[in-house]
Amino acid sequence: MSDLKLAENNFWGNVANSGPISIFSYCASSILMTVTNKFVVNLKDFNMNFVMLFVQSFVCTLLLVILKTLGYAKFRPFNKTDAKNWFPISVLLVIMIYTSSKALQFLAVPIYTIFKNLTIILIAYGEVIYFGGKVTSMELSSFILMVLSSVVATWGDKQAMQAKSLVESDVTVPVVPFNVGYLWMFANCISSAAFVLIMRKRIKLTNFKDFDTMFYNNVLALPILLLFSFCIEDWSSTNLSTSFTANSFTAMIISGMASVGISYCSGWCVRVTSSTTYSMVGALNKLPIALSGLIFFDAPKNFLSIFSIFLGFLAGIVYAVAKQKKNQNPEK
């Protein structure tokens, strides 16, 4: 990433220019953030998602300021004009990360990861509408696989819930309640697509770099998150002590640091490898994130659930290849 000061020699210079290390770091940061978020929202009686997101944004902002002070990151100082131009993006960011936390709270990590692919479809057709883009036949094939993987994942989830219902009750016909997590996931896909599409326009207006975007996203999100928390969430001492244990607070801090790590490692990976390698890593990374849900949490482990993970994985690879072919052969 051009905004970072990197070592040029000796051991750290070799690390900073290592493709395999950059790829591993990117994957590890992504998994760490997903797992820590799932850990927090799944804690018994935890109900303060806005505060959790506030802590993460605060940690991210603080870490960026420290990196800038040490000379390892560069971004613009805060000013009212940029803040005014960027504020709508931060509002969308808050909606996106809140709906994401709620979806992760109710859905298993593999299902959450698979359904996140649907955001790609919304963004692709959003670009067709707003930027005059084009969807190739190979991209369309990947979209079909994404939708299919989501349908199979839903069947697997329903099958797992039916089996659980039979074990926990004496009924012969299990009653499976609707999982509200799917509604949160749907809202997250829409808000994520809107965030990406509108941010693309705003970046052209403000000429922000990567760390400018991160800094303003998080700084402007802080008061919004706190306001919504005060209005909606229970700030009683009893609820605070229940929601904020040493383990949950530590996980929030780690998650905030991981968000900075993901952004840095994205640029690092592109710099020392190529955009082609990075896009493939992004596609392949879906698999370890989904598998982490099977390892660390009680996610459905039936045939349909496992099959949906590999369908989503295949969809990601097809999409990455389609994007690379599209970039190599731009329309004249």
Swiss-Prot record:
Segments passing through the bilayer: 15-35, 50-70, 85-107, 111-133, 140-156, 178-198, 213-233, 249-269, 277-297, 302-322
Gene Ontology molecular-function annotations: GDP-mannose transmembrane transporter activity
Keywords from the named record: Cytoplasmic vesicle, Endoplasmic reticulum, Glycoprotein, Golgi apparatus, Membrane, Sugar transport, Transmembrane, Transmembrane helix, Transport
Membrane topology of this protein: Multi-pass membrane protein
Topological domains, Cytoplasmic: 1-14, 71-84, 134-139, 199-212, 270-276, 323-332
InterPro entries per the UniProt record, alphabetical: TPT_transporter
Gene Ontology CC annotations of this record: cytoplasmic vesicle membrane; endoplasmic reticulum membrane; Golgi membrane
Signal peptide boundaries: none
Keyword rRNA-binding part of the UniProt annotation: no
Compartments, record wording: Golgi apparatus membrane; Cytoplasmic vesicle membrane; Endoplasmic reticulum membrane
Source organism superkingdom: Eukaryota
Chain segments annotated as coiled-coil in the UniProt record: none
Family, as annotated: Belongs to the TPT transporter family. SLC35D subfamily.
NCBIfam families for the chain: nst
Subunit structure of this chain's protein: Homooligomer.
Function (record text): Involved in the import of GDP-mannose from the cytoplasm into the Golgi lumen.
Name of this chain's protein: GDP-mannose transporter 1
Gene: VRG4-1
